[in-house]
A protein has these predicted regions:
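Residues in well-ordered beta-strands of folded domains
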Residues: 8, 33-35, 160, 189-191, ...
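Catalytic micro-motifs at enzyme active sites that drive phosphoryl/nucleotidyl and oxygen chemistry
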Residues: 15-23, 163-168, 174
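Conserved catalytic cores of phosphodiester-cleaving nucleases, focusing on short active-site segments
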Residues: 175, 184-192
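Activation/maturation switch segments at domain boundaries
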Residues: 1-114
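Short, surface-exposed basic-aromatic patches at helix termini and helix-loop junctions that form
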Residues: 21-25, 185-186, 238-242
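Metal-dependent nuclease catalytic core centered on acidic motifs
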Residues: 108-167, 193-263
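Metal-dependent catalytic core segments for phosphate chemistry
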Residues: 181
Length: 263
């Protein structure tokens, strides 16, 4: 699977498709090529299931392992969890396993698919030449966003920039309205805070997140900020994600690692 998180997850476990019938399996938004195995010792050039399984576990570790996902499941509002269980045949164990799969697919789809499949990194990418031109022009004046994207890709996240504004028709004097979108095509919103060390700066960045369309994860990068410590940044981020009802932010700290900060 080159584009589908579900198929990338399945590929981590070797040849799952043992029959032609199983190979016909599909799911929403899937455009992946299915390679069935009908015998022992099957091989596909470039396919590294052992390496992919290691990277699967790396993604699982990011989410806190199964224990961390159980904590999420347990913290889910009772009505939401019961509805999830009901949707899976009133079997709590099956429902939790489906929840684990769902969260893993969400995490894998944030990652660089080239890295997930092969261990190699794609680098910064752009959906088209217009986006590339606009970004390169902007980065000449302020390279912070580019630096953060490079660091994210080095940490195995997909760093593909797209048009981060949608222009829709609207019944106003301009005849249109502009809706801001996440910075990256995966739904990652980048907040690079290098030159400021005030609480208000963190507040304004966090406050803007709910107003953007399609944000799946926000990364706050303070790795090169000499005016604020990781500890202080964590306190401010925690304060404002609670205030603005944001479930999670990942902070890129001075040690170059991503830290999950949950509401």
């Amino acid at each position: 699977g080159e584009t589908c998180g579900f198929c990338l997850m399945l590929s981590s476990f070797g040849f799952n498709y043992k029959t032609k019938e199983a190979a016909s399996h599909s799911h929403p938004k899937c455009d992946c090529r299915v390679v069935p195995s009908f015998g022992k010792g099957s091989k596909v050039k470039g396919y590294d299931p052992d390496g992919m399984y290691d990277r699967f576990n790396e993604c699982l570790d990011t989410l806190g392992g199964r224990n961390g996902l159980w904590a999420e499941w347990d913290a889910m509002p009772d009505a939401e969890r019961e509805a999830y269980i009901k949707a899976h045949g009133n079997k709590a164990g099956k429902a939790f396993d489906k929840y684990v799969n769902k969260r893993m697919v969400e995490e894998i789809e944030l990652r660089d698919p080239k890295w997930y499949a092969s261990g190699e990194h794609s680098g910064i990418e752009f959906t088209d030449s217009a986006v590339k031109g606009e970004k390169l022009k902007r980065w000449k004046k302020d390279p912070g966003e580019r630096i953060t994207a490079e660091k994210l890709n080095a940490l195995c996240y997909k760093a593909e920039f797209w048009e981060d504004e949608s222009h829709l028709t609207a019944p106003n004097s301009d005849g249109k309205t502009t809706i801001s979108r996440a910075d990256l095509s995966t739904g990652i919103e980048i907040k690079t805070i290098y030159g400021a060390g005030s609480e208000n700066t963190f507040k304004s960045h966090i406050k803007s997140i709910p107003g953007k369309n399609g944000v799946k994860l926000t990364v706050v990068d303070v790795s090169e900020n000499e005016k604020v410590t990781d500890e202080q940044a964590i306190k401010w981020i925690s304060k404002y994600i609670a205030r603005y009802h944001i479930s999670e932010v990942r902070m890129l700290g001075h040690d170059g690692k991503l830290l999950r900060i949950k509401k």
